Amino acid sequence: MISMKYRDLRDFLSLLEQRGELKRISQPIDPYLEMTEIADRTLRAGGPALLFENPKGYSMPVLCNLFGTAKRVAMGMGQEDVSALRDVGKLLAFLKEPDPPKGFRDLFDKLPKFKQVLNMPTKRLNSAPCQEQVWQGEDVDLSRIPVMHCWPEDAAPLVSWGLTITRGPHKERQNLGIYRQQVLGKNKLIMRWLSHRGGALDYQEWCEAHPGERFPVAVALGADPATILAAVTPVPDTLSEYAFAGLLRGHKTEVVKCLSNDLEVPASAEIVLEGYIEQGDMAPEGPYGDHTGYYNEIDNFPVFTVTHITQRQDAIYHSTYTGRPPDEPAVMGVALNEVFVPILQKQFPEIVDFYLPPEGCSYRLAVVTIKKQYAGHAKRVMMGVWSFLRQFMYTKFVIVCDDDINARDWNDVIWAITTRMDPSRDTVLIENTPIDYLDFASPVSGLGSKMGLDATNKWPAETPREWGRPIKMDEDVRARIDALWDELAIFSDKDAKR
């Protein structure tokens, strides 16, 4: 599966630069708003990753738009193109529910997958590049880092690509998650994690098991691409993100123990923030412009106190912005969509395709095409999408179509909705379900409704009426006209080029 390997972020950047996928910007650019505007224009044009070498007021370069195209997401996962991410999804589906070999030949066919599993354990180092420079105590100062202030009405600079590492009580496995963090002071950040996310669950369990005790936290900035992408990929609960990163990378993830706690961080990370959350220490976070295209409301979240900053020599700060799609999370969603498909198909073989349109904020609307086998089949698939993977817990709309519809073509999907649906019969509404806290359209924060649209052809049990047959030209006629088409010269060469 692996075709490209990177030991660290710098290794990846070198390859991107060789391929014209990285642009160095030497002009002084301000992290306050200017970087966002440049990054946004570049991403919308399908441009390269950006390395701002001279941020105004800082000596540390800033990396933006690293995963600003689906191709670069695929490259970060060790693949040459997005279509190959289906193989990543197949591997995850296998790891989620491995099928035992049915015989010697089947065992032989599965050997490559078993060999990849050998790369899953982490490799622990005694020293690491991420600890080449150390600040602690009074020397800790987050203002040394050129944290971007992305939008005019944002409350403060925002750490956007922090890989947060936590461990719940009595757990061996660490959790890795990407949570935005508002800069609150020279040694304090606000950790905005939603209650169902791994870091928040670890913290809740810690508070129950160790009342009053500080909760250890580490945040890695600028990890290698495999580790970053593993943190946003739907890995099985039994598999750690570090282990999956090893599979993607083709060799074990190298980690090192923090200086102030027992958490293990990526050894090659550019910057690591170590510290703790004091139980009950909360602060109002926001407002911030987010991936919906709006500023979100203010809410209280835990305060992360930083006791140590460690970093590499000549560290690079990895950052991004979020806004109305397309933004970097939306682009990543398009690529990771290919990972989801095989996982869903293993559980629901009738699924032909699954698509999360980026304009739907990457997860709020899903289009599913199926090989329909019985009356009510579409409703079963809706319920399956909402319940099978927690990544779709916040998906508000699920549209189910037949397999003659292209899930990724709105012309097809809208035609199916308007010709195969009766709004009363074919719409499913479910109230009081979990909803994204950023969704201000829901009547209650974190709680709202979901809608399923059955845009499939209806079976006799679903309607007493004779169902329409799609118009289709005779194949012999199509073949004759294909052969005659160029001779007809209906379009001139000039018109054809248009």
Curated annotation (Swiss-Prot):
Binds 1 prenylated FMN per subunit. It is a peripheral membrane protein. Pathway: Cofactor biosynthesis; ubiquinone biosynthesis. GO terms for molecular function: 3-octaprenyl-4-hydroxybenzoate carboxy-lyase activity; metal ion binding. It holds the Pfam family UbiD. The keyword rRNA-binding does not apply. Its main location: membrane. It is found in: Cell membrane. Catalyzes the decarboxylation of 3-octaprenyl-4-hydroxy benzoate to 2-octaprenylphenol, an intermediate step in ubiquinone biosynthesis. Belongs to the UbiD family. This is 3-octaprenyl-4-hydroxybenzoate carboxy-lyase.
